[in-house]
């Protein structure tokens, strides 16, 4: 199960398909657009932070036991799967009538799957979740702040 979850979390496929389905179901293109924006920002942030911290993955630090999936060649901290999963789960919980608990359970399982399959330390997954939450929160503040402020009133 965790190997499958690890693969589903790859390239945001699970989240982007869920966002596309929600956008079609509720006829709201912003659901997909903002979920995609959260995914892209989360992916870019995790890549930047990985280069900054340059932390080895468990198989590099200790090659025994063998990981259950192929080990990515990039650094580990934070987990990109956790970052993108939590960013997308928060956006979907915010924009849709879907109950947030299952979204966060799936995000947590994807994050845990990366530890279970042996390609991340627990801190990588937890840090990814925190970064994902921060990105989604920033996106929400950006969008709701823009909606609230709206265009300037005409000069009087």
Language model regions located:
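Small-polar-interrupted transmembrane alpha-helices in polytopic inner-membrane proteins
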Residues: 36-52, 101-113
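Interfacial segments of alpha-helical transmembrane regions
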Residues: 17-45
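Short helix-capping/hinge motifs at transmembrane helix termini and TM-loop junctions
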Residues: 10, 25-26, 53-54, 97, ...
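N-terminal transmembrane-helix/juxtamembrane module of multi-pass inner/ER membrane proteins
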Residues: 1-15, 46-74, 151-156
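Membrane-embedded catalytic cores of phosphoryl/pyrophosphoryl-handling enzymes
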Residues: 18, 63-156
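Membrane-helix interfacial "entry" motifs
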Residues: 3, 23, 27, 31, ...
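Membrane-water interface at transmembrane helix exits
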Residues: 22, 46-50, 54, 93, ...
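Alpha-helical transmembrane segments
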Residues: 8-12, 32-36, 99-105
